[in-house]
Design a protein with these regions (language model features):
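Short beta-strand elements that form the blades of beta-propeller/WD-repeat-like
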Residues: 1-6, 46-52, 86-94, 133-150, ...
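Structural motif
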Residues: 9-13, 55-59, 96-103, 146-151, ...
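Blade-loop segments of beta-propeller domains
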Residues: 11-15, 20-45
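Short coil/turn segments at the loop-to-beta-strand junctions that recur within blades
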Residues: 26-34, 72-78, 117-123, 164-170, ...
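Asp-box/WD-like beta-propeller blade repeats and closely related beta-sheet repeat scaffolds
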Residues: 35-39, 51-100, 112-121
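Repeated scaffold domains used in trafficking and secretory/extracellular systems
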Residues: 36-40, 75-83, 123-131, 193-197, ...
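Loop-centered beta-sheet repeat module
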Residues: 100-153
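Conserved blade-ending motifs and adjacent loop-strand segments that build the rim/top face
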Residues: 160-190, 224-251, 258
Length: 297
């Protein structure tokens, strides 16, 4: 497992599947192979790519954590993905103007194309994890609290869109453009939206977190027939529930994360193995792995 720790430490690490620490990638600093503010990463057979937003560069490590090289990029970006053809796609940090939201570069980080300009005045304001996420259908591109998700092909070109219809609970357009200002102006926040890029568990089964400003729900849905079910997170929720899904292998396995913060927020915490409780009490987080089983009549 590869994890970008977005706590104050902001480090990139990897673990074996049994939880054994494996490697740390880079460190805080200004030198080669060092980052100031790692914001996103991508992993494939060629290594680990870390996007350092503040320094406007991409650092490339091999699986063992050794530095391969780094490249400067001439823009601020929130997300990175290496494409099948060896080129890269970046989601650009919005600045209120109609700059492109997607910039494509060659393997040396030279811009070669762009698409999907932001709406005039768009500044975002809501941090989204997993802006680019792989699925069996293609590469999913999503920024919260938008009500649409773009599916890209292997070269990063838009194929189709999935629209999320929350009816009268949909986020107003003003909030989609500037979420921070929308909240600061004391507008109601009783609107539903995805917290992060939803996760494809199989071709037709997706999972994600939604919130309405007061409550959090785990939603399982089929985006192609509008069928869905949601479970509200309350003190009656079990620690073994899928509370914060973060990753799937797209074959029925979903990985979620739990932390010590859940101790007084849900039940069954004391039923965790002592080794897990001790690890959580020491400030660690734990990955919870769930497997969906599908039965045919």
């Amino acid at each position: 497992y590869y994890i970008l720790d977005k706590s104050s430490l902001r480090t990139v690490v990897s673990f074996k599947k049994d939880g054994t620490p494996d490697t740390k990638y880079g460190r805080i600093g200004q030198g080669p192979g060092e980052y100031v503010f790692p914001w996103d990463m991508d992993i494939d057979e060629t290594g680990v790519y870390v996007l350092d937003t503040n320094s406007k560069k991409v650092i490339h490590y091999n699986e063992s954590g050794n530095l391969i090289g780094e490249r400067k990029i001439p823009f601020f970006a929130d997300a990175i993905k290496r494409l099948k053809n060896g080129n890269f796609i970046f989601n650009i940090t919005p600045d209120g103007t109609q700059i492109p939201s997607l910039i494509y570069t060659d393997s040396l980080m030279n811009p070669i194309w762009n698409s999907r300009p932001y709406q005039e005045g768009y500044v975002g304001g809501y941090t989204t994890c997993g802006i680019f996420r792989n699925s069996n259908l293609g590469l999913c591109f999503y920024r919260s609290p938008s009500d649409s998700l773009a599916i890209l092909d292997e070269n990063g070109k838009v194929q189709t869109f999935i629209v999320f219809d929350f009816l009268d609970k949909s986020v107003p357009q003003i909030a989609k453009i500037d979420y921070i200002a929308f909240n600061q102006n004391n507008h109601s926040i009783d609107y539903l939206h995805f917290v992060n890029n939803p996760i494809s568990v199989t071709d037709s089964l997706w999972i994600g977190l939604i919130e309405d400003g007061h409550n959090q729900y785990t939603i399982i849905f089929n985006p192609f027939n509008n069928k869905c079910g949601a479970k509200k997170f309350t003190k009656t929720s079990s620690i073994y529930d899928i509370i914060e899904p973060i990753f799937s292998d797209n074959k029925g396995t979903i990985v979620s994360v739990i932390s010590q913060e859940l101790k007084n927020k849900c039940k069954d915490y004391e039923l965790l193995p002592d080794t897990i409780i001790n690890a959580l009490n020491d400030g660690n987080r734990v990955l919870l792995i769930n497997k969906f089983h599908f039965y045919r009549n």
